Structure formats: structure tokens, C-alpha cells
């Protein structure tokens, strides 16, 4: 049965490209999939700390994780700060990442819960919906909710409010209406004429999911072992992971550059001695004989010697008499070319590409020999992601807020007390 169009027509968003970048360059290990027919990566070579940015949640055998999402720009700023100063304190990191940042926005009440999660690996973040009391028409007021807490189902929330009003557990509600559209959330709770908006809103905070808490459990697999990580631990693990990815990518590119240069060195020698090469091929009984004769003969290298030495590869050696022996790979590459193409190749065409490869090989070797270069590459790639995708914080942090008391849930009324 063919897959539904919602699956076959799905496409990745632009940030996803930075989760998969260089996956084809031996940057991560692969393993068999569930039925052994395909290979799949054990981890994605993400260029930004995706576990913190997107968060994670799940339950396994004997353990659970619940990592909240964070602001991309804030997390990258903290990562860059740790790269610049590996001894940075957790308090300094919290200045960059003060609290989670939820895609649904809403208000984060206080920072103590987030701070505990960042310093100990577990904590609880209090989230409150963004709501205002507005006059919707003359002498009629309503509570207008424009942002709801993370992972709260809007339909369920509206049903709960309606049930509370119907059961008179929360008095003062005349009507609840969902006016949300593609531009955002808008839930309108119309109040009765004699209701006090602040009291009704406080009651809704207490009895509904307009106010909820997110329990942070920062459990992750670190080196294949489950570990409760602090903010410092997450960023340190990511930086170490990116070091490995960049080193493996550079080693792959070095290997490919050397493989190409090996072919080019053989072609350069062949072009320099093109008449003898063509004669050898034509006088051979079959390709196997031609390959053997190309490999056993010492070919004059002449002006190609400096380019061969420039490659800095032990597999390219010039004999003491200035000649060069072709390898089997080089001989096969020469034989794979049509004679017309071989005779048309110019020495400059080959040597120009060799010079370009030599510069790349030198740069790759420098990167692999220098941790500072690797860290510079990691920083630059993080800055590239930040420049393209960082957005302002959605969840506003209310650093100081008063605890809700019983008096906040009671309608204020004028009373007369008669004492006799």
C-alpha cells in the first residue's frame, strides 16, 4: 500500500539541514536498521545542541527523560562562551540561558526551578498563560488568553473552563469562545456583568491548566550511558561531540583529496609521456597486459616532480633517477580514459588541479594537528546557525511574582457587620 501524501510530500525545514550536514562524510557511525536491510546513523552530526534547543521527552524501561526546549540563540551564545572559556561557571552559563523557551510562549514564573534543573539536573518550571482583561463591548469584559503553557491541549483547556462555569465552581463566567486562527491563539472568556476579572482569572490559574508546571528531568545518553546532566554537562558533551565530528569530516576530506591527487599524479605522468603511454596501450594484447606494462616501467617524471612532492603523501614517491612508478589504481584510471581524451588532456589542466588539492591537503593536515583550528571551525559553524535561525525569546520570564493566596480567589464585596 503506498504511503499517504502527508508523508511522501513532507520536506525538511531549513534548520534540519544543519542536523544532517556532512552525514555522508563518515562523521558518525552507522548501524543496521531493524531488519538489517539498510544502514542508519547512530546519532546525527548536529551543528547545534539540538537536545537543549528542541528538548526531549520519553519513558523507557526504568527511566524517563523530560528536557524542555530552549532558545536557539541563547544556547549557542552559551556554547560559544564555553568554547572561549572552558572553565566558565554554571552561574555564568545561566546568564546566557536563564530559563527554557517554549514554542507556545507564555510566562515563566521565577527562575529558581530552572536554576535547579541547570545546576542539579532536576527541577520544576512554573508556566502561566498570557492573559489580559479587555473590554469587548460597552460594560462587558472578558479574559483574553493569547498564549498557553507548553504541552497544554487548547480544546481540553476550553472544555475544562466550560465545565467549571457550568458546575459553578468558578462563578462569573458567561461564555467561552475559541477565536484562534492561523495567526495565533485567542481564547475569549466572557465575564458576567458583576464579575471581577482578576478574581476569575486567579481562579482559572488555580483550577485549570492556564497555570502548570514543567518537571525537568535532564537525563540523556552520554557516551552510551544514561546520565543526569547539568547545563554545563550538556554543553561540554556537545562540544566534545562536535570536535569528533569535525575531525572525522576533515580526515574524510583529506582521504578523498589524497585519493584524487593520487589519480592526478598518474595522469600527469601519463600526459608528460603521452606518446609512450599510448604506444604501450596499443601494443598490449589486452587491458591486463597493458596495466602490468604501465606499472612495471619507470616513467620519466620531469617537470611533474615538484607537484608530486607538493602533495605530501607517502604513496607518491619519485625514484632516485627522477622516474615514477604507476600504481595499479593509477594504471586503471589511465586505461579507463579513452585515448582521445588522454591525448587531449593538457599538463597545465592536471597541475592546476594538483596545486589546488595540495593547498587543501595542507589545510586539512593543519586542522587535524591543531585543536585550536577545530574549535574555531565549531565556533564559526555555530555562528552561522545563529545568524540564520536565532529568534527573540518567546517565553517571558517574570523574575519576581507574588504567590497566589486564598484571598486572591475570593470576590471582594462591601459588607456591613452589625454588632449588638
Residue ranges of model-derived segments:
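Conserved mixed alpha/beta core segments that line enzyme active sites in large multi-domain catalysts
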Residues: 20-48
Amino acid at each position: 500500500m503506498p504511503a499517504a501524501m502527508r508523508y511522501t510530500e513532507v520536506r525538511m525545514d531549513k534548520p534540519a539541514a544543519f542536523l544532517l550536514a556532512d552525514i555522508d562524510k563518515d562523521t558518525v557511525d552507522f548501524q543496521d536498521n531493524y531488519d538489517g536491510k539498510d544502514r542508519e546513523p547512530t546519532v546525527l552530526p548536529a551543528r547545534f545542541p539540538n537536545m537543549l534547543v528542541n528538548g526531549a521527552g520519553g519513558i523507557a524501561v526504568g527511566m524517563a527523560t523530560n528536557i524542555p526546549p530552549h532558545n536557539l540563540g541563547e544556547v549557542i551564545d552559551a556554547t560559544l562562551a564555553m568554547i572561549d572559556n572552558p572553565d566558565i561557571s554554571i552561574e555564568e552559563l545561566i546568564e546566557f540561558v536563564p530559563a527554557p523557551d517554549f514554542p507556545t510562549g507564555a510566562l515563566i514564573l521565577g527562575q529558581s526551578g530552572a536554576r535547579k534543573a541547570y545546576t542539579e539536573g532536576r527541577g520544576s518550571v512554573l508556566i502561566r498563560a498570557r492573559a489580559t482583561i479587555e473590554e469587548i463591548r460597552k460594560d462587558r469584559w472578558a479574559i483574553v488568553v493569547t498564549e498557553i503553557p507548553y504541552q497544554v491541549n487548547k480544546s481540553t483547556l476550553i472544555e475544562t473552563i466550560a465545565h467549571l462555569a457550568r458546575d459553578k465552581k468558578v462563578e462569573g463566567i458567561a461564555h467561552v469562545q475559541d477565536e484562534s486562527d492561523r495567526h495565533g491563539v485567542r481564547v475569549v472568556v466572557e465575564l458576567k456583568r458583576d464579575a471581577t476579572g482578576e478574581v476569575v482569572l486567579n481562579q482559572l490559574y488555580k483550577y485549570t491548566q492556564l497555570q502548570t508546571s514543567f518537571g525537568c528531568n535532564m537525563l540523556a545518553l552520554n557516551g552510551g550511558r544514561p546520565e543526569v546532566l547539568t547545563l554545563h554537562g550538556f554543553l561540554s558533551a556537545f562540544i566534545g561531540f562536535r570536535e569528533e565530528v569535525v575531525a572525522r569530516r576533515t580526515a574524510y576530506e583529506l582521504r578523498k583529496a589524497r585519493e584524487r591527487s593520487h589519480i592526478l599524479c598518474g595522469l600527469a605522468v601519463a600526459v608528460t609521456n603521452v606518446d609512450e603511454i599510448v604506444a604501450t596501450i596499443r601494443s598490449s594484447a589486452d587491458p591486463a597486459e597493458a596495466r602490468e606494462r604501465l606499472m612495471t616501467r619507470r616513467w620519466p617524471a620531469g617537470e611533474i616532480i615538484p607537484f608530486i612532492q607538493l602533495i605530501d603523501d607517502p604513496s607518491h614517491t619519485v625514484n632516485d633517477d627522477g622516474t615514477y612508478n604507476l600504481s595499479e589504481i593509477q594504471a586503471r584510471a589511465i586505461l579507463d580514459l579513452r585515448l582521445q581524451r588522454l591525448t587531449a588532456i593538457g599538463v597545465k589542466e592536471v597541475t592546476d588541479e594538483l596545486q589546488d588539492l595540495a593547498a587543501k591537503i595542507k589545510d586539512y593536515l593543519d586542522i587535524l594537528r591543531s585543536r585550536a583550528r577545530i574549535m574555531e571551525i565549531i565556533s564559526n559553524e555555530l555562528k552561522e546557525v545563529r545568524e540564520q535561525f536565532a529568534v527573540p525569546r518567546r517565553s517571558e520570564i517574570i523574575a519576581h511574582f507574588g504567590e497566589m493566596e486564598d484571598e486572591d480567589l475570593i470576590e471582594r464585596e462591601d459588607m456591613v457587620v452589625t454588632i449588638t
